[in-house]
């Protein structure tokens, strides 16, 4: 290999390793909202508590790419949706509004998504996302998504799937580990 080819190859490798690359992680959680008594329906107790708790830094998607917590430069929510998956033909119209927050030890609770439009007959609803960098939450010992929900319990028990996708920007070190296979 001549010097010019080596220089060009080295420059291309350096450029590839200095740029961020993104890893997308998607997950789903299913919860059941039980049908309510008349009193519960009037009280507005919807029974939709903690959303999901997770440790993204230990996810297989990151580990398989050779990425460690120190390699993460930015994390943003790309998609969040709720879907009534049971009963057949069910919808989310019993919900008035949902605010989704992220929490982690020693970090403030921050609003990351919200929705206040749950039309009758529509099983799938996508949330409006806030522009929040979740990096500090993701690299903490644990991260929790929590919800503030208003509405009434449904007429019949409803299974709701909550789906989300986060995009994780990885530093040059993580990109190089991925490119060279060094883990």
PLM-predicted stretches and their roles:
Residues 82, 153-183:
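Exposed low-complexity, polar/acidic, P/S/T/G-rich flexible segments that act as propeptides
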Residues 73-89:
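A short beta-strand element within beta-rich, extracytoplasmic domains
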Residues 106-115:
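Surface-exposed loop/edge segments in extracytoplasmic proteins
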Residues 37-71:
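Post-signal-peptide N-terminal segment of Sec-exported extracytoplasmic proteins
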Residues 1-7:
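Bacterial N-terminal signal peptides that target proteins for export
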Residues 75, 91-98:
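Short coil-to-beta strand junction motifs in C2/discoidin
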Residues 15-16:
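C-terminal motif of bacterial Sec signal peptides marking the signal peptidase cleavage site
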Residues 116-167:
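Cysteine-clustered segments with highest specificity for TGF-beta superfamily mature ligands
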């Amino acid at each position: 290999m001549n010097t010019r080819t080596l220089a060009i190859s080295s420059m291309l490798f350096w450029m590839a390793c200095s740029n961020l690359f993104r890893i997308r992680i998607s997950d789903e959680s299913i919860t059941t909202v039980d049908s309510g008594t008349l009193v519960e329906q009037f009280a507005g107790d919807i029974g939709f508590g903690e959303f999901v708790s997770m440790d993204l830094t230990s996810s297989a998607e990151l580990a398989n790419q050779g990425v460690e917590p120190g390699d993460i430069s930015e994390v943003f929510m790309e998609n969040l949706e709720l879907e009534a998956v049971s009963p057949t033909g069910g919808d989310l119209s019993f919900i008035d509004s949902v605010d989704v927050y992220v929490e982690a030890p020693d970090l403030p609770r921050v609003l990351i998504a919200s929705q206040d439009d749950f039309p009758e007959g529509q099983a799938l609803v996508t949330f409006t996302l806030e522009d929040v960098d979740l990096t500090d939450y993701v690299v903490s010992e644990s991260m929790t998504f929590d919800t503030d929900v208003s509405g009434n319990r449904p007429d019949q028990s409803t299974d709701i799937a909550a789906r989300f996708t986060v995009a994780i920007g990885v530093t040059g070190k993580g990109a190089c580990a991925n490119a060279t296979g060094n883990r």
